[in-house]
């Protein structure tokens, strides 16, 4: 008890981004998301997979969104094994280079092995949309723009 009352509030881009990432967990069906800066700083201490590059509300530059899969030294089993992470990474590479057919094929393979992987369903849906629309590399931007907080 003191007569002085302090109100501590965190503000700024970092806190806003953290809030956006927390909300994206619902979209991607994930538990913990981190940005590219955190991923880089963590180094070999974690296993993570790049889910997306996202432009959040109020920002022009896309932010890398990573799913934390496993912390080194922790007893739990990683969310995805190395084979599935490699398949996901190949699908992401296809996506980034606008090879939507390759992306679709790899994601179908991944989903045959782990049918409950929400990020794979989301990326597969986007790849199929771009195949249907005839998107080419000349009008391609691999990042996603969020229009809501």
For each predicted feature, which ranges?
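Cytosolic regulatory/linker segments at or just downstream of nucleotide-handling modules
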Residues: 18, 25-102, 109, 114-133, ...
